[in-house]
């Protein structure tokens, strides 16, 4: 996913940490 839902607006920080790639999806599942 290239765009994050409004509910995950604060994911900007984890994206910086994970790099915002495949790990982005994993983070969504872990913190959904």
Curated annotation (Swiss-Prot):
Ion transport as UniProt keyword: yes
GO biological process, alphabetically ordered: ATP biosynthetic process; proton transmembrane transport
Assembly mode: F-type ATPases have 2 components, CF(1) - the catalytic core - and CF(0) - the membrane proton channel. CF(1) has five subunits: alpha(3), beta(3), gamma(1), delta(1), epsilon(1). CF(0) has three main subunits: a, b and c.
Organism: Spinacia oleracea
Functional summary from the UniProt entry: Mitochondrial membrane ATP synthase (F(1)F(0) ATP synthase or Complex V) produces ATP from ADP in the presence of a proton gradient across the membrane which is generated by electron transport complexes of the respiratory chain. F-type ATPases consist of two structural domains, F(1) - containing the extramembraneous catalytic core and F(0) - containing the membrane proton channel, linked together by a central stalk and a peripheral stalk. During catalysis, ATP synthesis in the catalytic domain of F(1) is coupled via a rotary mechanism of the central stalk subunits to proton translocation.
Protein's cellular compartments: Mitochondrion; Mitochondrion inner membrane
Keyword line: ATP synthesis, Hydrogen ion transport, Ion transport, Membrane, Mitochondrion, Mitochondrion inner membrane, Transport
Chief location: mitochondrion
Superkingdom: Eukaryota
Cellular component, GO annotation: mitochondrial inner membrane
Organism placement in taxonomy: Eukaryota, Viridiplantae, Streptophyta, Embryophyta, Tracheophyta
Family: Belongs to the ATPase delta chain family.
Name recorded for this polypeptide: ATP synthase subunit O, mitochondrial
